[in-house]
């Protein structure tokens, strides 16, 4: 999704509170509730009656399940002929059931989200004084930044080593040895030439792949993914067209996030499909890191990322809290 200054082609109104946007190549469905324009490769669908948001979610979820995946081919000719299964009551579509079903799923997901935020420590979005101080150094005018933070230049190869993780079996079969869905069997994330989704497209069996944790993933090949960099704090394996590097010093998640972002900023514009981001090249590149008394300031890196995490997660925590309180209120009233 992008933005433009031109007048919207489709306008949300009381008569049409939602449009459904169908991705012709991807089979994806999105629901638009604000004015928008379109470019290409999408179909704009106007509901024939005023469905609620939950009813639309139910309908398009059922609809997508019936559309055969033809890869990058166009799908609308197939999608418009699909017959879908919907709940009925007394011979009519049971919209009340659909609404209740989606509402129940929402409440379940909110509870799971709340539990995850609590367990991971992300439910606390209040900044400590040290975190505020770290952010303040970046809130100052651009010309003062170098005065507030001391930076040093470091060679990537002096800070990291490349890991040579392998597939353990003698032969590899893509159809049976990996899965696009994470399951109890296929539970190890595998890096490859993936743009987005933290560089993960496939999962493998733990016993089939050599793995490492607290590493950084660098994509060395790919039309748009070359030189994409992703932190991989969890146990991870290597599939193809990417490699893992590991710091030569102990790090935690926050420091790993800082380092991966810094590397990406340094190399992303230098490499591409015609100039692969192999380790022999990348290790010679330099990155800028905060320093204190002539040494890398890991404490500042950790504080800054921790503060940014809290700022990013704040709205999610407040949203979850609001939904949980609303659910408790409904249960109490009923």
Indicate residue ranges for each PLM-predicted region:
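Non-catalytic DNA-recognition/assembly elements of restriction-modification systems
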Residues: 1, 89-197, 293-334
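A generic structural motif
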Residues: 48-51, 87-92, 248-251, 291-295
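An amphipathic, hydrophobic-aromatic interaction surface with interspersed Lys/Arg
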Residues: 81-86, 284-292, 304-305, 309
